[in-house]
Amino acid sequence: MTLGCLCILVSCCLFGYSQYRQYKEIKNMQTLYEETIPLIPDNYISSQGGYLDLQGHYIEAVLEVGSIHWVIGDEETLPHYKNKNIIIPESLLKQVQSLKNRDILTIHAVSGETIKYQVEVIGKVDQLSKSMPALYCKNGSSYYCINLIKV
């Protein structure tokens, strides 16, 4: 009986800690987003491979869709580019799953370039595709996929 109670207590603590970590990561992402937005120029400035260095993170762009406001960086803990795709950390899976078909996703690069995409929710897939731009989030052994159609 005591062992069962102890197991329940430990699992509750681990669940609470994972929720706290997820909240903290989202809060840090919001802070980076708010610091990045004023630094992006209104007009396009020709540059290749440009980034901003904020709090030790190399920020390439910001991403907006609905209530989601993220930065795109070059490290695994942030949304980042891989080929034509945007890879989202697993901690942001719930936010990714909240996206709906036909939502408009906007990316503002640090060069001032703005690109808009329409969201097409695909769901679970086994591997990343290189055929068209997509947003992927690791979901266990598979990926949650959203195709991005340029508007």
Where would I find each of the regions flagged by the language model?
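Solvent-exposed, non-transmembrane regions of membrane-associated and secreted proteins
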Residues: 4-151
